[in-house]
Amino acid sequence: MKHLVLLLLTLGFLNNIQAQKPSDKIIGIWLNEDKTNKIEIYKTNDTYSGKVVWISEMESNPNLHPKDKNNPNPQLRSRSILGMDIITGMQYSNGKWANGTIYAPKKGMYADCKLELLSNGQLKIIVSKSGFTKTQIWTRK
């Protein structure tokens, strides 16, 4: 009986792993390229967003709560960066996530964003603004 229960639990676990949609493979926590922030990517309905869940500066100073002081909207400058959505509106199509926006709190800048899951499991972030493109590689945590 114990073996049967163990077998059923194992099969259920393996089924869940295989059942994960390709579009959901980016869901999880990612460390940004300069290792200063962890971003949790999550799904709401059919779009993906990413919020800041860890800021390296807070390790040495737990009382520090960085604010969005460079936001172009003065009414948002007092909001905390921790917990803030910095990636919004990502839509999955043909192995990539596109049509989203990324916000850089340190610069107070919004830009177009695309995401691509690389074969090594890293996440390629492609940011475009005014004809310029920058790429970052994030690592899953």
Question: What do these predicted ranges mean?
Answer:
Residues 1-22:
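Bacterial Sec-dependent N-terminal signal peptides
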